[in-house]
């Protein structure tokens, strides 16, 4: 299988005025001679005369670093998806902008009419990730003469989506891939899916357990699923012994060891002696003794451990695996029937493309290095202790699912500091109204601007603004004059070559719903425009979401940046048809599961896209509209149907009391009721194109196709196309 190496074409150099993400400095601002500002069309001239290519955008956003081998920039300036990684042929690449247009175009134009935000899943990438992980371990096992095999386990908590889990079971059945569950619902999900998977695939039961959980796990064992109950707490052992005897089931038991090895990275708190889960060495000895007394020591077959998520280096990995392998060998010495060593999670991904051991957004290794380190560490300890090599497992959920999912959202507007311009007469009038101190600051500011003294200009501009604010508070300046201060300061800033202020781009998204890890733990994800990458970005901006919360913004980006290079928005938004689309990548793990309903913004629409031989190289195999306003209201225990009836009754009263003809009253009522019904059926997000509105669509439905033209499944779905599902106006 292809190696997942990340490289950046060193031959591409940044155009004037830009630096790449890994650069630590930018060119010094140009000082205009005699303080005279450049012509207002200079920026446009620079943009058109300086050649800008997709390769420049790829380097600017470090796409070849974090995106390889699945994402690149094509010759049209769009993000291109390589569903089979390095084995993707040129005609198999998928233009992401074409996928977005297919999803969002109205149905009467051949689109699906889905509303943003939109999650696009690529199951082919999921398959490639599984195969690459298995291939890396297979190579390590073969090259090092390891006398057992590797079989992975997917922790469903990373992304419990039905199709994601089913795809993993299907794609992994040929190499005994299993599932891990940490709760009773996840266990039920895993049991059902593994009925179609490999019989050797493990069903690892982690998390806190009560009698019901353990009974369910033992039922799975009865159903011939290869189920292992992993002891996270010492007291769980008594329940396992008692319930297994009552059910007459011989359990497979694992235990989670609390290692001393700990890493100090972003997720280091999940590891070490003070980690949330696991048994100390003292507890492990007691568990072994109790199992021996119960005649069940042969049931203990698996050792599980977790060094921590996003393990930064192979040195730390080798240290932790070596410690765990010592515990494994000791369990063998004590008589346990050991067969498996489960490395847990920790296989990291490179969010910023730097391959750095010192970054919370990166890791200093690839899949092959990870696999080789694990195999070598286990083999070394077992050979020294003369212990049979165990089957190696890992729960590498983040590494499996992160790449396969892309979040697409629109920038709908931007906030700029367009200050008013003053004529010489207005300027003279403004200056006359300033107090002596403010007037002195203005004169000093003008003089410093003529001399081109940037730092001095900033000082006097700040002082002038502050003094004018104080005058405004005292009632000595009106609001127009206060606004004029910004215009003066902006003019001077341009005259001395100061950089343009960072803009705020308003995006049709809830960060709390779709990117919760950014808000909660400062996790950074690569965010880039998915089109216009053959054009030079003209501004820098931060992203502000739709929520009524000051935390609902993204002002930190990979590469240590506090703003993102962006393109100018047109009069109706971005470039193509007034749209400007951004993509958040590598967010396929955890983000959907952790997202909440802040401001009652629900989840995104979801599109499942497979590579095909069709003209555009892709087929939509599943489309799920995002939750409607009614759906999210219902999730908070409201009753949308009753709410609709209440509002419809109020509308009827309002129309009845109006001084209109009876015929007009009927039309007015029908219009109001229809508008209310539409509001309940629409998604909570902004509808930037009325043709993309999801009225008259069953939001709870799934739609499938085998080609690019989507078709409904069953008469029920087809009938639902033409009705406002629960809110029909009689």
UniProtKB/Swiss-Prot annotation:
It catalyses: L-arginine + H(+) = agmatine + CO2. Disulfide bonds: none annotated. GO terms for molecular function: arginine decarboxylase activity. The active site is at residue 548. The keyword rRNA processing does not apply. Its cofactor is Mg(2+); pyridoxal 5'-phosphate. It is found in: Plastid, Chloroplast. Keywords: Alkaloid metabolism, Chloroplast, Decarboxylase, Lyase, Magnesium, Plastid, Pyridoxal phosphate, Spermidine biosynthesis, Transit peptide. Its EC number is 4.1.1.19. GO terms for biological process: alkaloid metabolic process; arginine catabolic process; nicotine biosynthetic process; spermidine biosynthetic process. Pfam families: Orn_Arg_deC_N. The modification N6-(pyridoxal phosphate)lysine is found at residue 157. Residues 1-37 form a transit peptide. Disruption phenotype: Reduced alkaloids and nicotin levels associated with a lower putrescine production. Occasionally, an early senescence and a lower viability of the older leaves is observed. The keyword Chloroplast applies. The record marks 306 as: Stacks against the aromatic ring of pyridoxal phosphate and stabilizes reaction intermediates. Pathway: Alkaloid biosynthesis; nicotine biosynthesis; Amine and polyamine biosynthesis; agmatine biosynthesis; agmatine from L-arginine: step 1/1. Gene3D superfamilies: 1.20.58.930, Alanine racemase, Lyase, Ornithine Decarboxylase, Chain A, domain 1. One of its GO terms (cellular component) is chloroplast. Involved in the biosynthesis of pyridine alkaloid natural products, leading mainly to the production of anabasine, anatabine, nicotine and nornicotine, effective deterrents against herbivores with antiparasitic and pesticide properties (neurotoxins); nornicotine serves as the precursor in the synthesis of the carcinogen compound N'-nitrosonornicotine (NNN). Required for the biosynthesis of putrescine. Catalyzes the first step of polyamine (PA) biosynthesis to produce putrescine from arginine. Belongs to the Orn/Lys/Arg decarboxylase class-II family. SpeA subfamily. This is Arginine decarboxylase 1B, chloroplastic. It comes from Nicotiana tabacum (Common tobacco).
